[in-house]
């Protein structure tokens, strides 16, 4: 539960956000992985939902009126430097009834530290 976003690298974008990465890897180990987050009602948000679905991760990703989250990634001396943008969709995660049901059924929950900057 938490941020789902696009890491914008100099050579393209990569699906990111620790919680969705955790859900994917948990699923690879035989667990049920569920992504709970929010994306914007925009092309980047639709691409995130498609990408999460194509990876086989169950999703409870709500769509809201904020832009889909992105993180700018640049390399300085071979090391990544991140620009994390605020007031994006995952800053305002809507807990849908489906998401609440998945949380109640969960054996473990991974939540992102970035999402802790907002009330949800």
Where are these regions (language model features)?
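Secondary-structure boundary/capping motif
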Residues: 44, 118-120
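Glycine-rich phosphate/adenosyl-contacting loop at the front of the ribokinase-like
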Residues: 1-57
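Short secondary-structure boundary/capping elements
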Residues: 1, 14-18, 64, 91-95, ...
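Short glycine-rich, flexible loops that bind phosphorylated cofactors or substrates
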Residues: 7-8, 92, 117-118
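Conserved N-terminal subdomain of the carbohydrate kinase-like
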Residues: 32-113
């Amino acid at each position: 539960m938490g941020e789902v976003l696009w890491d914008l690298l100099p050579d393209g974008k990569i699906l990111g956000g620790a919680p969705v990465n955790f859900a994917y890897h948990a699923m690879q180990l035989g667990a049920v992985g569920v992504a709970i987050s929010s994306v914007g009602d925009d092309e980047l948000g639709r691409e995130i939902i498609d990408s999460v679905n194509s990876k086989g991760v169950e999703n409870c990703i709500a769509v809201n009126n904020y832009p889909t989250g992105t993180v700018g990634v640049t390399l300085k001396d071979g090391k990544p430097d991140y620009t994390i943008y605020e007031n994006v969709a995952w800053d305002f995660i809507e807990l849908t009834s489906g998401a609440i049901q998945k949380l109640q059924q969960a054996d473990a929950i991974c939540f992102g530290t970035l999402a802790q900057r907002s009330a949800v």
